Every structure is written in structure tokens, then in C-alpha cells.
Amino acid sequence: MNPENWLLLRRVVRFGDTDAAGVMHFHQLFRWCHESWEESLESYGLNPADIFPGSRKSEVTPEVALPIIHCQADFRRPIHTGDALAMELRPERLNPNSFQVHFEFRCEEQIAAHALIRHLAINAQTRHRCALPEGIDRWLEASGVGKIGSI
């Protein structure tokens, strides 16, 4: 399986994604990051019900939660309604219980924005750190960046 199938996604900016000035509002970029991460996991073959609580198809609540502990974004140029964006995800394992995903948004071959979202694995009951879920581990390894680094 080719990582490009789940790490390079495309999307068109809709009117509802923009503000009164006609450009993407900053919070929409973070929503797109999270949605593209979810889409990436699904394209890789993971069932969202196994990762995210509250899914209709979930028979049990996942034992591990993955809260966002850090996020940042930089806009390099305005993103307008109708812009076709290519979104590249670059996941990076930080240690056995955390990872981050770098996002690059391109419009007409120019970088329009960068973002980063960092997740920490915690036991959903105790709220203490724990190992990443097996599916996330597999996704990180298959994405070709599964080496443990420093935070």
C-alpha cells in the first residue's frame, strides 16, 4: 500500500469555510487538519469507531483517548472560496505515547498554510498516559516515519 494514498488529500474551499472578507477563517484550518487526519486513518484502513468515542458503529468505547495537547498554524497566503487545496500529512511519532502531524496546504503549487497538531495517548478512564493504540502505531509505521524522536 502506497502512503501517498492516505497522506495526500485534496479538498475545495467552500463558502462556509470563509469569513466576511472571503478568506478561510483560521479555525477552519484546524477543522480541516483534524478531518484530513480522520480521512487519512480511514483511507489507511482503520475503523473510526476503534479510534474515536461516540461513533454509531462503535460497540465499545475505545480504551485510549488521543487529546490534542498542542496546535499551531501559519497562513502563507489567503485561501479563498473555490481554491483547490492539496493537503499533505506528515505524521511523526514523538515517543511511545505521543505523536504529531504536520500539515502542508498547497494551492496552485504554492504553500498556502502550514499547521501542526500534537496528540497524547491517555487511558480514557484514569486519564494517565499510556501507549498509543495499535492502529495508530501501524498507521505511523506505514507512513514511513515511525521512528521514536524527542519532544
Swiss-Prot record:
One of its GO terms (molecular function) is 1,4-dihydroxy-2-naphthoyl-CoA thioesterase activity. Pathway: Cofactor biosynthesis; phylloquinone biosynthesis; Quinol/quinone metabolism; 1,4-dihydroxy-2-naphthoate biosynthesis; 1,4-dihydroxy-2-naphthoate from chorismate: step 7/7. The active site is at D19. Its EC number is 3.1.2.28. It comes from the Bacteria. Keywords: Hydrolase. It is an enzyme of class 3 (hydrolase). InterPro entries: DHNA_CoA_hydrolase (IPR022829), HotDog_dom_sf (IPR029069). It catalyses: 1,4-dihydroxy-2-naphthoyl-CoA + H2O = 1,4-dihydroxy-2-naphthoate + CoA + H(+). GO terms for biological process: phylloquinone biosynthetic process. It holds the Pfam family 4HBT_2. Catalyzes the hydrolysis of 1,4-dihydroxy-2-naphthoyl-CoA (DHNA-CoA) to 1,4-dihydroxy-2-naphthoate (DHNA), a reaction involved in phylloquinone (vitamin K1) biosynthesis. Belongs to the 4-hydroxybenzoyl-CoA thioesterase family. DHNA-CoA hydrolase subfamily. This is 1,4-dihydroxy-2-naphthoyl-CoA hydrolase.
